[in-house]
From Swiss-Prot:
Its EC number is 4.2.1.10. Signal peptide: none annotated. It catalyses: 3-dehydroquinate = 3-dehydroshikimate + H2O. PROSITE patterns: DEHYDROQUINASE_I. This is 3-dehydroquinate dehydratase. The active site is at H143, K170. It comes from Listeria monocytogenes serotype 4b (strain F2365). The keyword Protein transport does not apply. Transmembrane segments: none annotated.
Amino acid sequence: MNKVVVKNVTFGEGAPKICVPMVGKTVAALKEEAEMLQTIDLDVVEWRVDFFEDVKDLAKVEAALDEIRTILPETPILFTFRSAKEGGELAVGDEFYFELNETLASTGKIDLVDVELFNEETDVLRLIETAHKNNVKVVMSNHDFDKTPAKEEIVSRLTRMEALGADLPKIAVMPKSAGDVLTLLDATNTVSEKANQPIITMSMAGTGVISRLAGEVFGSAMTFGAAKKASAPGQIDVNELRHVLDLLHKQF
């Protein structure tokens, strides 16, 4: 399997990396979050820009990013506009979604960009090309907040992401039962054994918490923890998360 190196973080080896989301609505709130995150043992910061009140003004988005980057100069930043259809805060058209992501990827000020799988393929491929030209890694994602698809479907989506050029394919699904969590873990194990790229998977909500902890066993390269406000159901406090990941890593 290929390792994916972003600044001082290597995905695809050792314990799963910890990503903590920033969800501030204003520049002041984002600066406060970034300063707090300086004090936390994390690997990646995800800026959930769909929470940002001035997201439709690209100059203001870049200015806010500059403020975050000043406070967190060495921390990998994952730039994510989560669409409303996949659980995000704001509904926007496809044209704006791609303009926003391509513009910010072109600045060279982000390290990773989230690209949702279920979009027009030509748009997805163009955004991946723009990202890679600017040395930005692509986290290609899919989120199902209603259910856990069949194992074959989860495997198919992750495999498709890699085929399209994702550096880190990602899927998050909602369990209705413990069996659904096992389905996600089984699919993760199957894909990670044959994939060329590290993958990121999780089963959400309380039932799925085990999937956020067991990535090193089943083959998920990153997990999401909460420092202030969780951006998805089931996210664990980042300090508790690090403790458990370290404990499992020592036994592995």
